[in-house]
Regions:
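Charged, low-complexity intrinsically disordered segments
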Residues: 1-140
């Protein structure tokens, strides 16, 4: 899907790239942001799992240089905006994804979050934004 002037292979790629969006064009940090885009054809652009690792919040991330920090304000609400924008672009512009979403009818949509080895319980996260987008599509 296309969003913010770039092509993205998944919402995961867009979401994690948004953590590094507010840097000056041409800077090393902005170049890191561009690695997530489909047109970069980089290793990270081809694998949502790598996108998650590159954009990881913990100190064990394997791919991101330590001096490349995520935007200070990302988790002050911008993370929610990025997720909804990415999902909206995906479902509004990709016919197959839209069809699959609509086939879920009125089901509660949840995402399983595994926290194995982190000392925390795994949990189900309700995707309210996705259900909101589905409702909008049904009302078209």
């Amino acid at each position: 899907f296309e969003l913010d002037g770039h092509m993205w292979n998944s919402v995961e790629h867009y979401y994690h790239a948004c953590k590094f969006k507010n840097y000056t064009e041409g800077s090393e940090k902005h170049d890191f942001y561009l690695k997530f885009t489909a047109e970069s054809n980089s290793e990270v652009s081809k694998d949502p799992g790598k996108a998650k690792s590159y954009g990881g919040t913990d100190s064990s991330h394997k791919y991101r240089p330590k001096h490349i920090l995520m935007d200070d304000d990302f988790f002050n609400g911008n993370h929610k905006i990025a997720m909804e924008k990415g999902q909206r672009a995906k479902y509004m512009n990709d016919a197959h994804s839209q069809k699959v979403l609509l086939l879920t009818k009125n089901a509660k949509l949840v995402h399983y979050t595994s926290n194995r080895g982190k000392g925390q319980a795994s949990k189900l996260v309700t995707f309210f934004d996705t259900m909101k987008i589905r409702k909008e599509l049904n009302n078209k």
